[in-house]
A protein has these predicted regions:
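Small-residue-biased structural context
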Residues: 1-56, 60-186
Length: 186
């Protein structure tokens, strides 16, 4: 496996983990009555911290990718235009963070928690994921390993950091909450 494949694999793992955490948060937090929230607070903290962290990482990567494309290609270049169109599409990381914040701010007493977490998950698995798929496809056109290193900001330390956050989510998950089976292997 070459270095670009290793980076692509890590990016894929991060997306799988983020999706699993989003589903687990919805499962555990959307229907939890206010009285139970204190018992699952460690999971809530670990899950939302993971999601906020990973969304911020993807946001940084998109900015670096956009900067690289702007430096390398003229404004009329079709590849640059495709990247800029994808970056301008609905489903940004900032929008996902705003929906995550709304879910966290929802009042369990007012029965808005399930609605807000549902909105977050629908956005995350819909527009955010669609936009990510397109950006991932466009990144495939980067031929140089140095470009991949620069854009991804993946190194041994960042992988350990991601795995530590992932392990914290799994360790604090309520017993009746499950992660999707395809994410448990990593």
């Amino acid at each position: 496996m070459n270095e670009i494949e290793l980076i692509r694999t890590q990016l894929s793992v991060e997306r799988q983990h983020a999706t699993a955490v989003a589903w687990a948060c919805v499962s555990a937090l959307a229907a939890a009555p206010a009285a139970v929230m204190t018992s699952i607070e460690p999971f809530r903290a670990a899950g939302t911290e993971y999601l906020a962290w990973i969304l911020a990482r993807f946001e940084e990567r998109e900015q670096v990718f956009h900067d690289l494309i702007r430096k390398r290609f003229a404004a009329a270049d079709p590849h640059r235009q495709a990247v800029e169109a994808a970056l301008g599409a609905p489903g940004s990381n900032r929008e996902a963070l705003a929906k995550l914040e709304a879910a966290l701010a929802a009042n369990p007493e007012a029965n808005t928690t399930a609605l807000r977490w549902g909105e977050f998950l629908k956005f995350f698995t819909g527009p955010w994921s669609t936009r990510r798929d397109e950006l991932d496809r466009l990144m495939q056109l980067l031929p140089k390993v140095t470009d991949w290193r620069t854009v991804s900001a993946i190194d041994a330390d960042s992988i350990v950091d991601e795995r530590t956050r992932w392990a914290r989510v799994k360790a604090t998950m309520p017993p009746d909450t499950e992660l999707s089976s395809n994410t448990l292997r990593v």
